[in-house]
């Protein structure tokens, strides 16, 4: 990011004294972007007032505004951009009435953010990292050669400060643009699922997969170059250790290392966060599908509502009477002592003891899979183990098996977004939907 020697109070006072302010409506921003694009197409980078009026006329038409006062409104818009330092106006006695306009650094920066920064791609990142690698390579060779302070400032400090650091800042800014892009994609997915989730599934899958692929491709590019860049920076750092007169170079190296670490770290964190969001969306879609697998009820209900006036119908609801209302409040407790021994089938067995027995048995069973590096087919394991327990214990046993298996590892197919098939695990209609666990922790 931008480095400055000024403190926060100094910058605040400076801004207040000069009364800096930015106020760009949608129309004014569109006008500025149109000027920037037009300016890029010109070789000299200079524009006449007539050019700006023509551009404003196009903006006015796009916003469906009246053309009666086009000249006055264009003049006001140009003056506003000049006043807010988006444009510089040049005029002299030789060009009276023919002012020349050029975009200011502020105007270029804002328009660049909205136009060129969104063209972030793996190819652009590769080119940037290649330039950085060449600059750092030359700087490290110059550092190992050694020389006076002028040599260090010209051949080491200058390339790192004005080339490498600026490219790192550009990559950092591009990552922040991608963060904003992810938020817009999330909003688009939420809107699709809110309107019609059945029709939106394909679109959501495409958006999720495309974003995941872009993030991984860019992060792979960063990881491939990151270690080499850090090694070159360490070479330069070794050359300046212990030399107090080169403290400015050492400080710059430290800042560059921190920037590079931050870029790579946030890239990986962004992938992890997106994977979590991807799973959340898939879980929502899967739950919605499971609630009405064949969509028979939803389609029939939608059809009935649509044709209600042609074929009226009644909706009957039933609510079971609560058991508490059926209790006889006058019953008295029986306090007679029960003597003798209970049959073994009726003896009490605590849930904690049962849980410990099942956990110990399942740990022994599942660890054997990990030692042999064999995938765990949960549906098959559940079916084999539930056969040894009564039906009343099936739920607790299945929950313990799944909990122990998930602790051992995960299924790579979960990351692909593919849905596993439902498979029966007992003879009473219980089914499970799970991929094979094939990657152990």
Swiss-Prot record:
Cell location: Cytoplasm, Nucleoid
Chain segments carrying region Leucine-zipper: 208-236
GO terms under cellular component: cytoplasm; nucleoid
SUPFAM superfamilies: MukF C-terminal domain-like, Winged helix' DNA-binding domain
Quaternary structure note: Interacts, and probably forms a ternary complex, with MukE and MukB via its C-terminal region. The complex formation is stimulated by calcium or magnesium. It is required for an interaction between MukE and MukB.
Gene Ontology molecular function: any one: calcium ion binding
Protein's UniProt name: Chromosome partition protein MukF
Gene3D superfamilies documented for this protein: Chromosome partition protein MukF, middle domain (1.20.58.590), MukF, C-terminal domain (1.10.225.40), Winged helix-like DNA-binding domain superfamily/Winged helix DNA-binding domain (1.10.10.10)
């Amino acid at each position: 990011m931008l480095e400055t020697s000024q403190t926060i109070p100094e910058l605040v006072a400076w801004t207040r004294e000069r009364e800096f302010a930015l106020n760009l409506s949608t129309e004014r921003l569109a006008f500025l972007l149109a000027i920037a694009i037009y300016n890029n197409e010109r070789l000299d980078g200079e524009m006449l007032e007539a050019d700006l009026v023509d551009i404003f006329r196009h903006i006015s038409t796009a916003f469906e505004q009246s053309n009666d006062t086009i000249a006055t409104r264009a003049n006001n818009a140009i003056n506003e951009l000049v006043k807010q330092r988006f444009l510089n106006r040049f005029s002299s006695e030789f060009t009276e009435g023919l002012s020349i306009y050029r975009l200011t650094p502020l105007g270029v920066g804002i328009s660049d953010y909205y136009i060129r920064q969104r063209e972030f791609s793996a190819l652009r990142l590769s080119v940037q990292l290649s330039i950085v690698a060449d600059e750092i390579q030359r700087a490290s060779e110059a550092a190992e050669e050694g020389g006076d302070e002028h040599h260090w400032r010209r051949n080491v400090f200058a390339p790192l400060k004005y080339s490498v650091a600026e490219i790192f800042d550009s990559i950092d800014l591009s990552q922040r643009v991608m963060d904003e892009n992810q938020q817009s994609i999330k909003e688009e997915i939420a809107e699709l699922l809110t309107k019609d989730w059945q029709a939106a599934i394909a679109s959501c899958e495409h958006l999720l997969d495309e974003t995941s692929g872009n993030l991984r491709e860019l992060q792979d590019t960063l990881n491939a170059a990151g270690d080499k860049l850090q090694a070159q920076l360490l070479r330069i750092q070794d050359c300046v250790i212990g030399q107090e007169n080169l403290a400015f170079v050492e400080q710059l190296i430290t800042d560059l290392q921190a920037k590079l670490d931050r870029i790579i770290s946030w890239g990986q964190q962004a992938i992890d966060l997106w994977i979590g969001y991807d799973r959340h969306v898939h879980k929502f879609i899967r739950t919605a599908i499971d609630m009405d697998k064949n969509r028979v009820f939803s389609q029939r209900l939608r059809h009935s509502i649509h044709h209600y006036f042609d074929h009226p119908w009644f909706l009957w609801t039933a609510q079971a009477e609560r058991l508490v209302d059926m209790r006889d409040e006058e019953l008295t407790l029986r306090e007679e002592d029960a003597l003798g021994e209970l049959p073994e089938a009726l003896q009490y067995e605590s849930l904690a003891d049962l849980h410990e027995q099942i956990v110990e048995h399942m740990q022994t069973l599942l660890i054997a899979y990990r030692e042999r590096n064999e995938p765990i087919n949960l549906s098959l394991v559940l079916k084999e183990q539930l056969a040894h327990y009564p039906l009343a214990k099936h739920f607790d046993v299945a929950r313990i098996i799944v909990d122990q298996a998930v602790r051992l590892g995960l299924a790579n197919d979960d990351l692909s977004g593919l849905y596993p098939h439902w498979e029966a695990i007992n003879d009473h209609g219980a089914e499970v939907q799970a991929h094979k666990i094939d990657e152990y922790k």
